Amino acid sequence: MLKALFLTMLTLALVKSQDTEETITYTQCTDGYEWDPVRQQCKDIDECDIVPDACKGGMKCVNHYGGYLCLPKTAQIIVNNEQPQQETQPAEGTSGATTGVVAASSMATSGVLPGGGFVASAAAVAGPEMQTGRNNFVIRRNPADPQRIPSNPSHRIQCAAGYEQSEHNVCQDIDECTAGTHNCRADQVCINLRGSFACQCPPGYQKRGEQCVDIDECTIPPYCHQRCVNTPGSFYCQCSPGFQLAANNYTCVDINECDASNQCAQQCYNILGSFICQCNQGYELSSDRLNCEDIDECRTSSYLCQYQCVNEPGKFSCMCPQGYQVVRSRTCQDINECETTNECREDEMCWNYHGGFRCYPRNPCQDPYILTPENRCVCPVSNAMCRELPQSIVYKYMSIRSDRSVPSDIFQIQATTIYANTINTFRIKSGNENGEFYLRQTSPVSAMLVLVKSLSGPREHIVDLEMLTVSSIGTFRTSSVLRLTIIVGPFSF
């Protein structure tokens, strides 16, 4: 400002000595300055004092010639003056005030510079630039006084450094960034300021020495939810398999694979970061853990069905042989054909056995036996042939399963008529040639037929069980036969 004031005063002196020149009067100042009627010169406006909340976001306001700066609170400003300190005598007509111009290099320690600037240290102010915290501002300020604008636009004016005269004879800011007159490095960004410029590192970089180096954002948590990938001047977030970035490009959210691209053949269950496949009953996961294969239940167990297991897709079923029906899905139950349908004649009776039925004559008596109302075959005493034959024969039928466990009581014989002073004995008269049976007397009038060898069917056994009755005084002797037909079924059920 002193330099501009000195030139102005010199111009006024020349004007006063030349009577032919038109007297120049000043009516206004450039932007950022106001007229001081006392000192008769333009003075800087301290916007930091008069503008409410001039800087936002925690920035500090630093008054600047013709304007102000909003810088981080940690920023420092070193003023670079291109002229050493000078003192000039006031010209005629001025207030006589002296404005000092102080070179930054003349400051030995930190302190406040004229115009509101700051100096860091003697070593730092030796050069024309400084760094201001992480934002990397390099600021050059030229605190020369702005020139007052003459009311006569035909006269040329002197502008402060960083300004130039416009076609309207006002001092306007020089955009050093556009003009290419800045001294920012190739890896820095030039930012134009009023009357000056600043050099700043691009986003994602920080100043280290004279260079802009990449900021590794991945070392400053928590930038990313899961994975952080640093790139020159930036970074990006990645998610683990099974997750995807949310709209904020930071948070990882689970991918519901069951909704997006269901790869499961049957059932899909989403879990955090993945999914699992399950199969319906009767199927199992294949080796790829996606598809389902039928389980051959019949191969895995031989106890599923009582008779035969039939594998089907996803299930199995049980079958029974002819003469049986499936009950409770797995067991076989004999069908009583005598209660449903049979082919027996009128003179035959139907006898059901395990797995089938047979027709037997309703009158099984053979000559010389005759049928009584009690369904007994009796040999008449009057018939001479009956003297050597059993007095009566009773026909009975029973059915047993194949391979029945032994020993097993299967049939009980008992006298229907009891005579006084008689003794009854029991024996197997015929049909036990292979020793499959044993007759055990259980009382004076009864005996139990015992199966002692397992029988396999289908087959039929006819066993004659005889009861001998003898008088205790030997007056008479008689016998009765129970002809038992044993039908062995084809299966053990």
From Swiss-Prot:
Q: Which GO molecular function annotations are given, in alphabetical order?
A: calcium ion binding; epidermal growth factor receptor activity; epidermal growth factor receptor binding; growth factor activity
Tissue expression pattern: In the eye, associated with photoreceptor outer and inner segment regions, the nerve fiber layer, outer nuclear layer and inner and outer plexiform layers of the retina.
Q: What is the effect of changing C70A?
A: Produces extracellular disulfide-linked homodimers similar as Cys55Arg mutation
The reply on keyword Ligase is no
Family, per entry? Belongs to the fibulin family.
Q: Provide the assembly information.
A: Interacts with ECM1. Interacts with TIMP3.
Q: What is this protein called?
A: EGF-containing fibulin-like extracellular matrix protein 1
Recall the taxonomic lineage recorded for the source organism.
Eukaryota, Metazoa, Chordata, Craniata, Vertebrata
Q: Which gene encodes it?
A: EFEMP1
